[in-house]
UniProtKB/Swiss-Prot annotation:
Requires a divalent cation for activity. The chain crosses the membrane at residues 60-80, 102-122, 149-169, 183-203, 206-226, 246-266, 321-341, 369-389. InterPro entries: PC_trans, PC_Trfase_euk. This is Phosphatidate cytidylyltransferase 1. GO terms for molecular function: phosphatidate cytidylyltransferase activity. It is an enzyme of class 2 (transferase). The gene is CDS1. The lineage of its organism: Eukaryota, Viridiplantae, Streptophyta, Embryophyta, Tracheophyta. The keyword Acetylation applies.
Amino acid sequence: MEEENVTSSPSTPVHRLRHRRRSNEVVTDGDKVNASPLLVNDRNKYKSFMVRTYSTLWMIGGFVLVVYMGHLYITAMVVVIQIFMAKELFNLLRKAPEDKCLPYIKQLNWHFFFTAMLFVYGRILSQRLANTMTADQFFYRLVSGLIKYHMAICYLLYIIGFMWFILTLKKKMYKYQFGQYAWTHMILIVVFTQSSFTVANIFEGIFWFLLPASLIIINDIFAYIFGFFFGRTPLIKLSPKKTWEGFIGASVTTIISAFVLANILGRFPWLTCPRQDLSTGWLQCDADPLFKPEPFALPAWIPEWFPWKEMTILPVQWHALCLGLFASIIAPFGGFFASGFKRAFKIKDFGDSIPGHGGITDRMDCQMVMAVFAYIYLQSFIVSQSVSVDKILDQILTNLTFEEQQALFVKLGQMLKDKLS
């Protein structure tokens, strides 16, 4: 009986000895795998890695195909992405019981969405639409009239939506309805701010859309690869899966890729020429000085055994380094912001439309930040802000009627004649 009491007592030396023995047992291989901090040693994570890889390859293939088709098709792709993003974000705060009592709330959201789309794209593409229609006098006058009253039409559509919202207010539902109204407008600001800059970059030359977008894709892929195989040190609490190894490895890869990729893409006129209309034909133009090769002498600290003392580069490659730095260091904070947002709403992903990636919005968080920076950098440091013949002609074609253009032509001809006489 004494032995039984000793054995059953948790405070006896025998029990403590047995406890220590259990803690010193040999760990099985399976336990070692699960205890490893590297994601590559986790079977579930490895399966997720393969699914994510297949999805990424399909997305890259589709992206390359659309880029090959040209400016107008890339813009159409941006519009489709916007619609999917808006759908995911609209659904985020919807509640089924309340929506059943408000049958028109979804239609109202989409009314505001398409009104905002008409306003944004009308302002961006109006001049190019007018340039496309100059050959047909009837369509040119029709388009000119629509452009002239574009803002009034958009405002009228918005007021219709505003009145529609007021008329659908229901007792005991006010807070939910006004919350949806505010949420809808926030979505429109986020989605269309990014897209307006993206489309503007596309028509300045596909290069200015393709390079920034590709750098974000490269950074995202290599952050995942370096983190998957080497990641041990957590980077930020908002995203526990992000590691310093992934962040640093992706940053170095992205900056190098920016310099190399700019040299490759900058040699194709089809990618570098700006598009002034909405046609789909191939482009040819005189190369901008940014895309003309120049000799570059390598620094003196390069070892003597290195075979090249001079190399040919494009001036745009130096600008590409700035884009690469931003894509690798600043743009990921768009992803961190999205992670914090998802934690606030206690969701894993914005959607499930892309296997292994989540929703469309999950892929666009860093792209939104990058598109805005690329546009601001392009307009501030690269594109000339001086008045040009093309810009004046665009203003004339957009803002003057056919009769006013004829009058301007006569007056301009008379002025030139007087100067020459």
